[in-house]
Curated annotation (Swiss-Prot):
InterPro entries: TPT_transporter. GO terms for cellular component: cytoplasmic vesicle membrane; endoplasmic reticulum membrane; Golgi apparatus; Golgi membrane. This is GDP-mannose transporter. It is a multi-pass membrane protein. Homooligomer. One of its GO terms (molecular function) is antiporter activity. Belongs to the TPT transporter family. SLC35D subfamily. Keywords: Cytoplasmic vesicle, Endoplasmic reticulum, Glycoprotein, Golgi apparatus, Membrane, Sugar transport, Transmembrane, Transmembrane helix, Transport. It is found in: Golgi apparatus membrane; Cytoplasmic vesicle membrane; Endoplasmic reticulum membrane. One of its GO terms (biological process) is GDP-mannose transmembrane transport.
């Protein structure tokens, strides 16, 4: 009996071990199959994400849409009934920008350097110029239509080009000069188109006030770009480093200016954010801030997957849909002069882009000389 009992116990242990081994192998096979499916799915989704990330047309479309979104949302807020908290609007946009790029950095999508006091001191003059540029831009957009604003913005290119000649030894080619003449012509045509739509003395006053802010913005923008170019050489900032410091340092300046120069009485706040469209206005303010990040990100994306040449052409072509968006979403003047100015300005941008490409090509073909 002892032998039989020992034999039966041995058989039982053998069966248990066999059952456990079979079950374990089945579980391992099931896990392997699941991993294979997951790997295939991940590979497929990863492949799709890679295709999108490396798609030139998608990057170009994203850049154009982000540009239009920012312009339209800014115009929506600024054209609201008696909106006068421009500094506050710009502060909100800068805060949203900092939060957005901080979130993107935490997700390892973008990277930028940590805050440094010495670099902040070197960069602080740029922050003041940025505030001057974006404030005058907001005032110009408040009084001018999007097409006219977009056309007159081209004049900044002329100031920057001749600023580069003076400060950096740049050169203005014959083709570039031709594009400048077209830019001036488009601005003159836009002026006639705007004047044709004037119906009252108040409209004329608002129009000329818009031109004043636009002219101021052109000089402020040119000064910002030229001086920032010098500072970038000192600090060796990349795109998102520049965005980080620009927005971070401008926030306190904008908030202080808002609290000092703007009316924060309950009546004025209610006037700027009426109950009927308060949520829509705040949403537009947040979207305009986020879209500024989108423009910078899509700019870098477009250059990476296409070329700087393609990007410069896209920048020129992009002025047409931005100008047309003003005709579609807002009551901009639509007449022969206004429509003609859009296409002349569009042509000027194309000629300038081609001129810059030819100039860069000639410079790259020049062999370095040594004494």
């Amino acid at each position: 009996m002892g032998v039989i009992s020992f034999y039966l116990i041995g058989q039982l242990l053998y069966l248990i071990r066999k059952k456990y081994t079979t079950t374990y192998r089945q579980q391992q096979q099931h896990q392997y199959n699941m991993d294979s499916k997951h790997s295939t799915s991940s590979s497929s989704s990863g492949s799709l994400a890679t295709r999108i990330s490396n798609s030139g047309p998608i990057s170009i479309a994203a850049y154009c849409l982000s540009s239009i979104l920012m312009t339209v949302t800014n115009k929506y807020v600024l054209s609201g009934f008696s909106f006068n908290l421009n500094f506050f609007l710009l502060a909100v946009q800068s805060i949203v920008c900092i939060v957005t790029i901080g979130s993107l950095k935490s997700l390892n999508i973008i990277t930028y350097r940590q805050f440094n006091k010495d670099e902040a001191k070197k960069w602080s003059p740029i922050a003041f110029l940025l505030v001057a540029m974006i404030y005058t831009s907001s005032k110009a957009l408040q009084y001018l239509s999007i097409p006219v604003y977009t056309i007159f913005k081209n004049l900044t290119i002329i100031l920057i080009a001749y600023g580069e000649v003076i400060w950096f030894g740049g050169k203005v080619t014959t083709m570039a000069l031709s594009s400048f003449l077209l830019m001036v012509l488009s601005s003159v045509i836009a002026y006639y188109g705007d004047n044709a739509a004037v119906k009252s003395h108040d409209d004329a006053f608002a129009l000329y006030l818009g031109y004043f802010w636009m002219l101021t913005n052109c000089f402020a923008s040119a000064a910002f770009v030229l001086i920032m170019r010098k500072r970038i050489k000192l600090t060796n900032f990349k795109d998102f480093d520049t965005m980080y410091y620009n927005n971070l340092l401008s926030i306190p300046i904008l908030l202080i200016c808002s609290f000092i120069f703007e009316d924060w009485s309950s009546a004025n706040v209610s006037l700027n954010f009426p109950a009927d469209n308060r949520v829509t206005t705040i949403t537009a303010m947040i979207l305009s801030g986020a879209s500024s990040v989108g423009i910078s990100y899509c700019s870098a994306w477009c250059v990476r997957v296409t070329s700087s040449t393609t990007y410069s052409m896209v920048g020129a072509l992009n002025k047409l849909p931005i100008a047309l968006s003003g005709l579609i979403f807002f009551e901009a003047a639509v007449n022969f002069w206004s429509v003609s100015s859009i296409f002349v300005g569009f042509g000027a941008g194309l000629v300038y882009a081609v001129a810059k490409q030819k100039q860069q090509k000639e410079q790259s073909q020049q062999l370095p000389t040594t004494k």
